[in-house]
Amino acid sequence: MVSTPPTLLMLFDDGDAGPSTGLVHREKSDAVNEEAHATSVPPHAPPQTLWLLDNFNIEDSYDRDAGPSTGPVHRERSDAVNEEAHATSIPPHAPPQTLWLLDNFNIEDSYDRDAGPSTSPIDREASHEVNEDAHATSAPPHVMVSPLQNRRPFDQFNNQPYDASAGPSTGPGKRGRGRPKGSKNGSRKPKKPKAYDNNSTDASAGPSSGLGKRRCGRPKGLKNRSRKPKKPKADDPNSKMVISCPDFDSRITEAERESGNQEIVDSILMRFDAVRRRLCQLNYRKDKILTASTNCMNLGVRTNMTRRIGPIPGVQVGDIFYYWCEMCLVGLHRNTAGGIDSLLAKESGVDGPAATSVVTSGKYDNETEDLETLIYSGHGGKPCDQVLQRGNRALEASVRRRNEVRVIRGELYNNEKVYIYDGLYLVSDCWQVTGKSGFKEYRFKLLRKPGQPPGYAIWKLVENLRNHELIDPRQGFILGDLSFGEEGLRVPLVNEVDEEDKTIPDDFDYIRSQCYSGMTNDVNVDSQSLVQSYIHQNCTCILKNCGQLPYHDNILVCRKPLIYECGGSCPTRMVETGLKLHLEVFKTSNCGWGLRSWDPIRAGTFICEFTGVSKTKEEVEEDDDYLFDTSRIYHSFRWNYEPELLCEDACEQVSEDANLPTQVLISAKEKGNVGRFMNHNCWPNVFWQPIEYDDNNGHIYVRIGLFAMKHIPPMTELTYDYGISCVEKTGEDEVIYKGKKICLCGSVKCRGSFG
């Protein structure tokens, strides 16, 4: 046999194939090679793959993450195995191993020092002894070396791991089991653990050896790193939120705060809306509604705080609300977020809860079979089945208890949500259905109690009138348009008191704007005000109105002694725009003709101008029932916002009393508009506001605008205070009002006379 030069053959185990005996020394590989050539009939052995590697770095061949390993074989252990192999004629069967042909191998790099326990690489002198023993053996063991199947340059090898247990393969195999995904057979430097704050971890999460994936028990979003404490937000100097104000007088007693009346309810709603309008005028960037309602609650501007079943003192059937928080402020619906309000068991006085009020917002599958019935959808669900708890449980309990439930219906008007109080209902039935979302939902049937004034029914009536203009077939219809085309909207005339009476009002000429009897009503305004620099589209409204426009979204913000409006094309003018509401003249039961609206009217809305003929005292007739006189005595009331509710100085309070330098007299007896049909009331829902008007011709006039004092439901009579001529004092606090006519308004504040 021709001897061959020694060739370095290395047996490698894949880290995933199980425990390995480590790396065989070079001289031992030479002995095995020579014995293999001397054997004529080699014994059967599993095929092995032979690879030729140049300049191979053995350190890259071992993966320290492959699992437990004994590291490179110790010298004594390697010698014992070698001697036993030479003494055996038939070598024992061993699992298939990969045979690598290595040149220029550096044994010092043949193991990873971090792989675990190891006896260090085999000494070279010890390897010589093993080699000499192998050559001295007379019967060398038969080892079969399969032919070289695949020779691949090392640069194409890419250090792909190979699983010896996978069977024969002609190339690198797929990553074996147990090796971490993405690991490579390269030398790795030990990673230094990152510093982290032990205080930032949860002690219940268990021990951890370092930075890793969040384990069970660790708070969601928590990371093993130190965090800088968050700095508290600085107070916003422009914030209008009020927490407390010791000097503020809410003008509401503790008893009135627990249980109110109509005067208190009206006052609270007007005060809240005044704050909201002021925030709109200031262009307050934060939530205006939330700020206004929170300030009112914090400073005690609220009533009916006691939860109760049944009617709410001061709230009438048919009253409207433009914001959810308004219902909370007056105690109609105390739940600030849910559509079902209820009493707890301890509050109701019996076992179990009881529903007190429900609000239909239009977002759910509520149905109305008729104007006296409501099918109400329970709360909860989406994306799960509704359960019988909280509000649903309270409504279900009300079926058995038969207690009254207040119903507030939400409707859209001009893209705004309006809530109508529809009175008291009884919950008659409860069942479950599958809703549009595919989940179980509760349904409750509510029946309206008879004998109540109409609420929601009025809303649906005027909705049909506005949308379809069903005027002619109406009960008591007389005339389709009392303005005879002068107004942009028709003004119908109806008499529902006596359908047989088709008499129309006294003969008069309908006019849209003020008529002056050959005189200029000069109010002695400084002439320099007419030569001001243009600020807002060539008008001087801002400067004349103390630097702020009087309107926001066509709503009056504050009452003032005098409001200035430019003529011509000024975009802020209101008087010259004409009617924007669907008004109608109707016959009242005891006060002649009256005026009402098909539309809901928000507080501060311009209704119409009181038009007529401007006169002097000498020109006024004694029996003129259609005379407007600014010199009369009027009941004072507070309508503007309170500075304390907006973190403003109390001295910034705007005066509301009219202070005209000259008396304004307007007679609508012969010429006028719909304003002439507005009746007197000692507790009105409309107030008048003097407006200075410039016709751009050097003439300045004072005109009278009529604005809504509070939210007015549709088909509610519109009234304002006519005032009285004189007052006699009978004591320090007692006065006698001496008007020309007897008052029949019937309000709780009726003075007995007017005019």
Curated annotation (Swiss-Prot):
GO molecular function terms attached to this record: DNA binding; histone H3K9me2 methyltransferase activity; histone methyltransferase activity; zinc ion binding
Subcellular location: Nucleus; Chromosome, Centromere
Region (Disordered): 62-98, 111-243
Domain Post-SET: 739-755
Top-level enzyme category: transferase
Domain YDG, chain residue ranges per copy: 310-448
Compositionally biased tracts (Basic residues): 174-193, 212-231
Domain Pre-SET as annotated: residue spans: 528-578
Residues given in the record as S-adenosyl-L-methionine binding sites: 591-593, 624, 626, 676, 679-680
InterPro entries: H3-K9-MeTrfase_plant, H3K9_HMTase_SUVAR3-9, Post-SET_dom, Pre-SET_dom, PUA-like_sf, SET_dom, SET_dom_sf, SRA-YDG_sf
Pfam families: Pre-SET, SAD_SRA, SET
Biased composition (Basic and acidic residues): 73-86, 122-135
Domain of life: Eukaryota
DNA-binding region residue numbers: 174-186
PROSITE patterns (alphabetical): POST_SET, SAM_MT43_SUVAR39_2, SET, YDG
UniProtKB keywords: Centromere, Chromatin regulator, Chromosome, DNA-binding, Metal-binding, Methyltransferase, Nucleus, S-adenosyl-L-methionine, Transferase, Zinc
Entry-linked PANTHER family: HISTONE-LYSINE N-METHYLTRANSFERASE SETMAR (PTHR45660), HISTONE-LYSINE N-METHYLTRANSFERASE, H3 LYSINE-9 SPECIFIC SUVH7-RELATED (PTHR45660:SF18)
Protein name as it appears in the record: Histone-lysine N-methyltransferase, H3 lysine-9 specific SUVH8
Species this chain originates from: Arabidopsis thaliana
Lineage, top ranks: Eukaryota, Viridiplantae, Streptophyta, Embryophyta, Tracheophyta
